């Protein structure tokens, strides 16, 4: 459970970073 929870948190963080990156790319 701990491992899966950690990976889920990493996935959410990666998804957020990807969305932010794409947003910055669109504004440029």
Curated annotation (Swiss-Prot):
GO MF, one annotated term: ATP binding
InterPro entries noted in UniProt: HATPase_C_sf
Keyword flag Chaperone: yes
Gene3D superfamilies per the UniProt record, alphabetical: Histidine kinase-like ATPase, C-terminal domain
Presence of the UniProt keyword Chaperone in the record: yes
Keyword tags: ATP-binding, Chaperone, Cytoplasm, Nucleotide-binding, Stress response
Residues engaged in binding ATP: 5, 21
Gene Ontology CC annotations of this record: cytoplasm
Location within or outside the cell: Cytoplasm
Taxonomy, superkingdom: Eukaryota
Family: Belongs to the heat shock protein 90 family.
Role description: Putative molecular chaperone that may promote the maturation, structural maintenance and proper regulation of specific target proteins.
Subunit-structure text: Homodimer.
Protein name as catalogued: Heat shock protein 81
Provenance organism: Pseudotsuga menziesii (Douglas-fir)
Classification of source organism: Eukaryota, Viridiplantae, Streptophyta, Embryophyta, Tracheophyta
